[in-house]
């Protein structure tokens, strides 16, 4: 039958499909529409390199830095406490179900904080730059478990696990996804380049060596003496790699297909 929902945005165009979903005890409705739009032209003509990291969420080649929000890290103790309380309850009992809902709501809050901050960051970058060059990072491979198997146990498992958590907490994949569709909508482009040695290469002379990286934040070339913030140097190398790709006449793409059909996704709380 019919039901009411909060119309958070005006629905425009021809409705193609409607999806109703539930998350953490709340119901959502997503409405996909199709409408004719003119080819967008990006208001900017600048090109920028973006270096994604853990200590800094994103560093641009022009020196702009976006600090991480670390929503999971800030709620880690509370999440652990709720999970301990869950383990003490009888499985599938009413109290167990209530405690499980509390954990789900906290997970949802952590994800919403991260997603909201990423939207603010990607909107700022997308509005100011027509072309964004990023590293073609394989996040799933970077965050794989190091535990190994019984016959071949992994090494430095605790250290690798400690690195995996902040990598996933930053939401690099989601940041890339948002940049791609926002650039598509605004007439800009996203170019993904190989990430190899961007943190070790000197953006001034091109000398590549692991000794150039003095620390997490300091970079000093052992040949020409060029010094800079390590993340800014990496972003400039990413930008230079993007220029090299364009100079070779290769097709500009982000590495994954983008749906060309103009759509609008509207989500409202039931």
Q: Residues of each region from the PLM?
A:
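Positively charged, helix-rich recognition surfaces that bind polyanionic ligands
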Residues: 4-15, 19-270
């Amino acid at each position: 039958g019919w039901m009411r929902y909060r119309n958070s945005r005006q629905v425009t165009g021809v409705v193609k499909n409607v999806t109703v979903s539930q998350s953490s005890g709340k119901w959502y409705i997503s409405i996909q529409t199709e409408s004719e739009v003119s080819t967008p032209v990006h208001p900017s003509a600048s090109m920028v390199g973006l270096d994604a990291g853990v200590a800094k969420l994103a560093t641009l080649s022009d020196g702009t830095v976006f600090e991480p929000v670390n929503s999971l890290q800030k709620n880690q103790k509370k999440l652990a406490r709720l999970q301990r309380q869950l383990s003490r309850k009888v499985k599938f009992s009413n109290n167990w179900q209530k405690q499980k809902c509390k954990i789900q709501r906290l997970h949802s809050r952590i994800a919403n904080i991260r997603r909201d901050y990423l939207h603010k960051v990607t909107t700022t970058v997308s509005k100011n730059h027509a072309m964004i060059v990023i590293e073609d990072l394989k996040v799933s491979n970077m965050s794989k478990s190091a535990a190994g198997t019984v016959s071949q146990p992994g090494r430095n498992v605790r250290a690798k696990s400690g690195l995996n958590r902040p990598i996933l907490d930053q939401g690099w994949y989601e940041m890339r996804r948002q940049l791609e569709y926002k650039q598509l909508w605004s007439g800009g482009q996203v170019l993904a380049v190989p990430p190899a040695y961007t943190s070790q290469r000197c953006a001034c002379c091109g000398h590549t060596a692991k000794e150039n990286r003095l620390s997490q934040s300091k970079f000093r070339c052992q040949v020409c003496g060029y010094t800079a913030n390590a993340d800014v140097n990496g972003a400039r190398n990413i930008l230079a790699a993007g220029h090299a790709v364009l100079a070779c006449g290769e097709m500009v793409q982000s590495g994954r297909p983008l749906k060309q059909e103009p759509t609008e996704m509207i989500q409202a709380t039931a």
